[in-house]
Amino acid sequence: MATIEELIESASSDMLNPEHNFKIARAYEEIGQTAAAMSFYLRTAEYGYNTHPILVYSSLIRISYCVLDQSGREHTLENSLLQAIQYMPARPEAYFVLSRQYERTQKWQECYTFAELGLMYTNRMEQLPVNVEYPGAYALLFEKAVSGWWRGRKDESLSIFNELLTQDIAPEYRSSIEYNLSIIGQK
């Protein structure tokens, strides 16, 4: 992979190109320079709005990861994901990332709602050019089950958890489901 300096130099004659800005953003994010990465993701979203929808959508989601560990930036995180949903509402990834964030902050109604909305759009689509940590529809079902439990939907949650255990899911989801079921005394 090219260095940041090489990427910037090669993009210097075409800095409005969303592809160049996206590559630079990724390079900055990979070395932990999230403020710089965010700036280039924003440039990607602005310059690619009408021409590069997948890059724009991916950039808006990655912005949420850039601010994830920064205290006081919760609204920026939420807004970047809501903008991604507004921009491409028929894709599941931003719904998942937002639902998972709501789970982590114990906003159960919001978690449940965005998981449910995301489940409407889980058909196979063009792969994103960057990892946004969306493993598949089962992750939205997991978020729905966890938040449903806290919202008083015990039977629905147990049913979803048990159904997920019959599927090919990532080990961390399987162990989390097994742990949750052991805590509530169900299997």
Residue ranges and their predicted role:
Residues Y28, V67-L68, Y102, G148, ...:
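Residue at a conserved register position within TPR or TPR-like alpha-solenoid repeats
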Residues K23, R62, V97-R100, R104, ...:
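"A position-specific structural signal for the A-helix of alpha-solenoid helical repeats
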Residues I31, Q70-S71, T105, R151:
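Structural motif corresponding to the intra-repeat A-B loop/turn of tetratricopeptide repeats
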